[in-house]
């Protein structure tokens, strides 16, 4: 049975070091609103956003009758010198989830999105010249496997890779390449529908192409008009976020009805996590969460 979660990023709790960080909501308010709006799971958010000791973490999550389903771990994977600290950070988070008895949770690995100027400026319009070289691909793939292997060997948790704009694994071509270069038993795919659409792809095609690798799913919609406005004004990824490029579910161009039909056909039974990435202080996250949950109900979930 597919279960529906939400995540702190829908409340503006993002991994980026932004001026708007001061507007972030506290974890108790976020968890209260996730529960109140009809979701049954959450992801962890940034390290330190929620309690970082297992008893306290489990107490807060159980208090709201939620499950912890994953934790986002950004790593500069194209830089070999950053792999070891990536392992350390992933193991720190995996230990917390394991010690809190969330043994089905995923490490949601990603590039260090937003750190590369060219990729951040050109989110949604990446050209071939902006992609990794063959040598960089080897380094990147090695880093993902190194982290995933360390996590499963030490704590038994699985790792999925999150496609994401403003990072090196954004386009369908890049996602295909990473899946080709990595062990299918070691690394799964966290397919984010909105980022995939923003990156120039059709999520339905991605599901068909990677159905054996998709272990975790993020539901996010995409508004191409906001993306075009950002492009026309020379704005980067964060400018597109401010314009609402990731709109409420059903308001963009992602065909969720067909996606759900295909997932059911493929017998997908894991979590779907709603992520409506917004900057801290943007909009009314609780209202967005209500509308997104109501929309998902129209899909039979």
Label the model's feature ranges:
Residues 273-287:
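A short, acidic, flexible beta-alpha connecting loop/helix-capping segment that sits on the rim
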Residues 42, 137-253:
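Acidic/histidine-rich catalytic cores of soluble enzymes
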Residues 19-23, 115-125, 227-239:
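Short, flexible, mixed-charge acidic loops at enzyme active sites
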Residues 43, 70, 106-108, 160, ...:
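Conserved beta-strand positions in the central sheet of alpha/beta enzyme cores
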Residues 1-103, 134, 138-139, 145-146, ...:
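N-terminal pre-domain/capping segments
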Residues 67, 82-189:
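Active-site acidic/histidine proton-transfer and metal-coordination neighborhood
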Residues 9-11, 45-47, 73-78, 110-114, ...:
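Active-site beta-loop-alpha junctions enriched in small/polar residues
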Residues 251-265:
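A short, acidic, amphipathic alpha-helical segment used as a generic capping/interface helix at domain edges
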């Amino acid at each position: 049975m597919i279960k529906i979660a939400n995540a702190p990023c829908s409340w503006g709790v993002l991994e980026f070091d932004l001026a708007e960080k001061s507007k972030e909501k506290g974890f108790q308010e976020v968890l209260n609103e996730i529960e109140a709006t009809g979701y049954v799971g959450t992801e962890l958010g940034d390290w330190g956003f929620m309690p970082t000791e297992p008893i306290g973490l489990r107490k807060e999550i159980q208090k709201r009758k939620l499950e912890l389903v994953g934790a986002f771990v950004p790593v500069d994977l194209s830089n070999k010198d950053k792999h070891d600290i990536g392992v350390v950070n992933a193991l720190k988070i995996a230990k917390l989830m394991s010690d809190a008895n969330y043994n089905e949770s995923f490490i949601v690995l990603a590039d260090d999105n937003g750190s590369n100027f060219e990729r951040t400026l050109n989110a949604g319009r990446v050209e071939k010249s902006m992609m990794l070289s063959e040598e960089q691909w080897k380094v990147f793939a090695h880093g993902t496997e190194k982290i995933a292997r360390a996590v499963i060997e030490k704590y038994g948790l699985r790792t999925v890779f999150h496609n994401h704009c403003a990072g090196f694994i954004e386009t369908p071509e890049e996602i295909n390449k990473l899946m080709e270069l990595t062990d299918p038993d070691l690394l799964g795919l966290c397919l984010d529908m909105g980022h995939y659409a923003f990156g120039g792809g059709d999520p339905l095609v991605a599901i068909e192409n990677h159905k054996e690798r998709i272990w975790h799913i993020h539901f996010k919609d995409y508004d191409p008009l906001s993306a075009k406005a950002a492009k026309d004004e020379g704005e980067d990824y964060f400018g597109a976020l401010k314009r609402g490029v990731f709109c409420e579910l059903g308001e963009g161009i992602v065909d969720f009805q067909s996606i759900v039909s295909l997932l059911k056909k493929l017998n997908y039974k894991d979590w779907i996590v709603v992520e409506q990435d917004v900057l801290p202080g943007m909009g009314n996250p609780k209202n967005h969460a209500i509308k997104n949950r109501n929309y998902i109900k129209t899909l039979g979930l």
